[in-house]
Amino acid sequence: ALPYRAEDFRREALWELSGEAFDPGMLNSLLSFFESREPLDKAWPVRLAGIRENLGVLVPFRMLSEDGEAYERLIFYFLFRYLLASGEDVDILSKIKFAVAAVTVISLLDAQTRLETGGLSLENRVENARAFSSEAEYSPDTMEDFWNACWDEEFLSFSSLAGFCS
């Protein structure tokens, strides 16, 4: 058994990493990054723009969600998938940043769905994760841009990413 549950680790990491309050501008920048890439589905940038327009409502709405365990499993999936691949290029930090960014965007897609429909079914959740995966993970250009942005963009700093998790 692990000495810490994921929630304990999250709380401790936030305490250590987030020296400043959550900045919605950083979240806006993250969404803008994915919105600005060449979409496979024309509705994708429209969905992300809608989320950016509603951040003031969606961020608190997302925090009220009781889906923490599902997002915990999702981040473990991304970590498992990308940390195994990082051995080829030893860029572990970017892979961790992608996992946090992916779950952040997916959780906002879920919050937007919940707000628009009054609920969130398993099918909705799967579709939101599939849409993100299709637009981000399966676009080599988007992934290459993300890996490069990890080193240069403030919205992908550890303090910004820790703020996304709070």
Question: How would you name each of these model-derived features?
Answer:
Residues A1-S166:
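Hydrophobic, aromatic-lined core segments that form the binding pocket/scaffold
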